[in-house]
């Protein structure tokens, strides 16, 4: 099920991430707090209960981050999020290197409500592990967020996510396709009419505004 996470406030998104992490790792996770460097990090120390799995859980000191966006068109493949030197991820890497110099950590996990494709995911994961010099780093995108919420019905209630459930969206190209389809269908009917004047006339007809108003009334 799709949820409009972009409509949540930044604080509520962070609280949602904490609840998910409590399910994945344990209740010992510390909520997001603002450090001296301006970053907002969540913390956990120990062995995760079931991340990435119960058979091979991560363990050690964790730093967890939530990166929220209100832009429905944003994705993890955007240059401003990953590729650029000043991208969101590269800025965080620079900041976290400073954190690690004083408070070393073993695992890093970023949550975002941006869509995360199978193409860019391994690139970001590898980049984080290399630049942070740790063995365990990953990013969780919109798709996995939706799966975690689906598995935890209490999150749907607590964060009122049903009212944010996305309806089907129609775009300009969809409307154009429908218009073209009706136009082609009408042309077919008109051609059949010309071939057989005695047939029933089921074609679409056009009327000027005056005649249209008379027919509608």
Can you describe what each PLM-predicted range is?
Residues 1-217:
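Mixed-charge (Asp/Glu-Lys/Arg
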């Amino acid at each position: 099920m799709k949820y409009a996470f972009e409509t949540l406030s930044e604080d509520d998104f962070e609280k949602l991430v904490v609840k998910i992490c409590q399910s994945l790792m344990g209740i010992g996770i510390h909520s997001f707090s603002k450090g001296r460097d301006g970053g907002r990090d969540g913390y956990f120390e120990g062995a995760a209960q079931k991340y990435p799995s119960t058979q091979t859980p991560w363990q050690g000191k964790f730093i967890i981050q939530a990166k929220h966006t209100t832009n429905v068109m944003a994705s993890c493949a955007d240059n401003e999020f990953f590729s650029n030197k000043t991208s969101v991820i590269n800025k965080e890497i620079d900041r976290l290197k400073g954190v690690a110099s004083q408070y070393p950590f073993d695992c890093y996990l970023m949550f975002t409500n941006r869509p995360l494709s199978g193409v860019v995911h391994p690139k970001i994961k590898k980049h984080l592990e290399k630049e942070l010099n740790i063995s365990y780093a990953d990013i969780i995108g919109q798709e996995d967020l939706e799966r975690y919420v689906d598995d935890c019905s209490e999150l749907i209630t607590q964060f009122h996510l049903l009212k944010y459930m996305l309806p089907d969206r129609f775009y300009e190209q969809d409307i154009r396709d429908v218009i073209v389809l009706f136009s082609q269908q009408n042309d077919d009917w008109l051609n059949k009419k010309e071939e057989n004047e005695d047939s029933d006339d089921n074609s679409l007809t056009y009327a000027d505004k005056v005649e249209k108003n008379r027919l509608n009334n």
